[in-house]
Amino acid sequence: MDIGIPVPNITLPATPEAIHKVPQAAEQLGFHSVWLGDHIVRPIGPDQPAYFKESSRYTWDLYEPMVSAGFVAANTTTIKIGFGVLVLPYRNPVVTAKAVASLDQLSNGRVILGVGSGYWPQEFQALNMPQRH
């Protein structure tokens, strides 16, 4: 069985230090993979997850997954680097394919690509895009 853990690029504690240290620790402990999430904005409204509520005392940054994955690749040597998931409608598909292929080559074949269609209306609104599903 292969076991992976999340990199906190969009969850607490989303900090450069955590994005640096969590994958290194996971690699040293023998985990198979680390996984990055993808969100553009935090949704606001009655249907948002509890941890995003405006009344929450917690705030954190949302680090871009491709950039974070490059950072992880540069600071590790063997652990697989997964996207769980990369939201394709937010990105140009040709540029995304090139970026993922480049990352996979630069990391010596360590990339696992998971893709999705997105589900938060606020993110599509922030990008001035229709939500087509």
Task: Name what the model sees in each region.
Residues 1-75:
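N-terminal beta1-alpha1-beta2 module of alpha/beta enzyme domains
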Residues 27-28, 70-78, 100, 104-111:
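Acidic (Asp/Glu)-rich catalytic clusters
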